[in-house]
């Protein structure tokens, strides 16, 4: 297996792999161990994904490395894991945007030092003014004295 295939298997639980295999096998009508790219969309929808036509074409182009017009189970796993990770990344970014808006009290699109201090104090941990300044300086990449949304995302990525 390729590195991507090994990574895909380690990302998924045994139950998920079994569930994906069951869906995959339903469409592998001749038992040859692969499905046609046409059937891919149907399988993905069964597993709760909802790819657009364009997304499907892009996925197929990426996954069908040998250009055979079919996808084997290992290629399929790699693709499903990519989709799941993209879904998760999209969700967490939305949640972070929501969080950002809550702390951007005056709605100016920035979190200033005062708002930033409130965030840190709201965690319940005691925080000194120096620590607030230090963290603020770390996050404020363009040194304008405030944290914009991109800087906020970067800070949150480093925490996770």
UniProtKB/Swiss-Prot annotation:
PROSITE patterns: EF_HAND_1 (PS00018), EF_HAND_2 (PS50222)
UniProt name for this protein: Troponin C, skeletal muscle
UniProt organism field: Anguilla anguilla
Positions of the EF-hand domain: 15-50, 51-86, 91-126, 127-160
Molecular function terms from GO: calcium ion binding
Function: Troponin is the central regulatory protein of striated muscle contraction. Tn consists of three components: Tn-I which is the inhibitor of actomyosin ATPase, Tn-T which contains the binding EF-hand for tropomyosin and Tn-C. The binding of calcium to Tn-C abolishes the inhibitory action of Tn on actin filaments.
Database matches in Gene3D superfamilies: EF-hand (1.10.238.10)
Additional detail: Skeletal muscle troponin C binds four calcium ions.
Keywords: Calcium, Metal-binding, Muscle protein, Repeat
Binding site for Ca(2+) 3: 104, 106, 108, 115
Disulfide bonds: none
Residues annotated to bind Ca(2+) 1: 28, 30, 34, 39
Xref: SUPFAM superfamilies: EF-hand
Annotated residues for binding of Ca(2+) 4: 140, 142, 144, 146, 151
Binding positions (Ca(2+) 2): 64, 66, 68, 70, 75
InterPro entries assigned: CALM/Myosin/TropC-like, EF-hand-dom_pair, EF_Hand_1_Ca_BS, EF_hand_dom
CC annotations in GO: myosin II complex
Sequence similarity: Belongs to the troponin C family.
């Amino acid at each position: 297996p390729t590195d991507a295939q090994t990574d895909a298997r380690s990302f998924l639980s045994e139950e998920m792999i079994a569930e994906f295999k069951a869906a995959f096998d339903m469409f592998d009508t001749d038992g040859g161990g692969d499905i046609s790219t046409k059937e891919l969309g149907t399988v993905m929808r069964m597993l709760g994904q909802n790819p657009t036509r364009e997304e499907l074409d892009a996925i197929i182009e990426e996954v069908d490395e040998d250009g055979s017009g079919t996808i084997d189970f290992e290629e399929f796993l790699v693709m499903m894991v990519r989709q799941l990770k993209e879904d998760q990344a999209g969700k967490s970014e939305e949640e972070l945007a929501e969080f950002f808006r809550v702390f951007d009290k005056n709605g100016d699109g920035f979190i200033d030092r005062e708002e930033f201090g409130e965030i840190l104090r709201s965690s319940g941990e005691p925080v000194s003014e120096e620590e607030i300044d230090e963290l603020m300086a770390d996050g404020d990449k363009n040194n304008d004295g405030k944290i914009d949304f991109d800087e906020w995302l970067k800070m949150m990525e480093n925490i996770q």
